Amino acid sequence: MNTRFLDACWGKPVDRTPVWLMRQAGRYLPDYMRVRSKCTFLELCKTPELAAEVTIQPVDILGVDAAILFSDILTPVEPMGMALDFVPGPVFEHPIRTMADVEKLRIPQMEQDVPYVLETIKILRRELANKVPLIGFGGAPFTLACYMVEGKGSKDWATIKRMMYAAPEVYAALMEKVTMMDMEYLNAQIKAGAQAIQIFDTWGGVLSPSDYEKFVLPYTTKLINGLNRQNVPVIHFVKGAGTMLDTVKKAGGDVMGLDWHTNLGKARDILGSMAVQGNLDPTVLFAPNDVIEKEVKRVLDENGGRSGHIFNLGHGILPTVPPENAIHMVECVHRLSQQ
């Protein structure tokens, strides 16, 4: 098996920089759209054979060094008692607003409530056995709570911020419950065979550094400390956290995911020996081949040859990117970083 990705997570030297892409199983791939055209998004997530098929597609098409489970961060929230739909984008019919709402939430029994996720992982471990490692993932407690309180996506997340300030006891009770659920969910993925875990805190960066430290850090730290992570590296990705990496680092984890607003070299200086993942601007993949190569080289140069770097985009690949551009990017990473 290609172990470059896992080796880099642990800061070990590798013969070339490993690379994978957030949302690498997605709408930019015609093969994905062929599968997706036959079912809804939720049906795809809940059908292990299909979820496994689309997980493997980018490994074969792009030549990436890791696969990431095809699912959605809100998958384990639905069995807490929150009806979820995608219309498009996630929408919860009854958002959490009061302590009574929080008290109604249940902690799912993962093997009974999300068996399709665990079965997908088991299928993938068999099918990827001689290829690449499998990354499991979940949303960070704060990002999950954002959707649960707002009921859908938001530009400013004012509803959950108002709860933080005006009803801190409700916010704390919700975050405790979501953190416990998250811990159970990610540990179930590890038990099923996930070889690494990525925690996505997509909205952590909407807070000030002091609010992040007060309202988010304790829960993410508790989550990471509660994972059964012997030989399973944890990647912590907080979008928009470039100005507070020293604070985010306190949560623990083995790899810091970086978005494209952060200079990778400066981030490494702040993070010390901690491995990093990132951080090409996703829109670079619309550029001509020579520009893609130049930008890949820039990111590699910012790393300065230090071990413990996994190449990735600074956020998910965009749906209208030409697949051949993503293939070219992966090839450039491998060729330019070859030792």
From Swiss-Prot:
The keyword Flavoprotein does not apply. Pathway: Porphyrin-containing compound metabolism; protoporphyrin-IX biosynthesis; coproporphyrinogen-III from 5-aminolevulinate: step 4/4. GO terms for cellular component: cytosol. Keywords: Cytoplasm, Decarboxylase, Lyase, Porphyrin biosynthesis. It is found in: Cytoplasm. Substrate binds at R23, Q24, A25, G26, R27, D72, Y147, T202, H315. Its EC number is 4.1.1.37. It catalyses: uroporphyrinogen III + 4 H(+) = coproporphyrinogen III + 4 CO2. CDD domains: URO-D (cd00717). The record marks D72 as: Transition state stabilizer. InterPro entries: UROD/MetE-like_sf, Uroporphyrinogen_deCO2ase_HemE, Uroporphyrinogen_deCOase. Its main location: cytoplasm. GO terms for molecular function: uroporphyrinogen decarboxylase activity. One of its GO terms (biological process) is protoporphyrinogen IX biosynthetic process from glutamate. SUPFAM superfamilies: UROD/MetE-like. Catalyzes the decarboxylation of four acetate groups of uroporphyrinogen-III to yield coproporphyrinogen-III. HAMAP family: URO_D. Homodimer. Belongs to the uroporphyrinogen decarboxylase family. This is Uroporphyrinogen decarboxylase. It comes from Geotalea daltonii (strain DSM 22248 / JCM 15807 / FRC-32) (Geobacter daltonii). The lineage of its organism: Bacteria, Pseudomonadati, Thermodesulfobacteriota, Desulfuromonadia, Geobacterales.
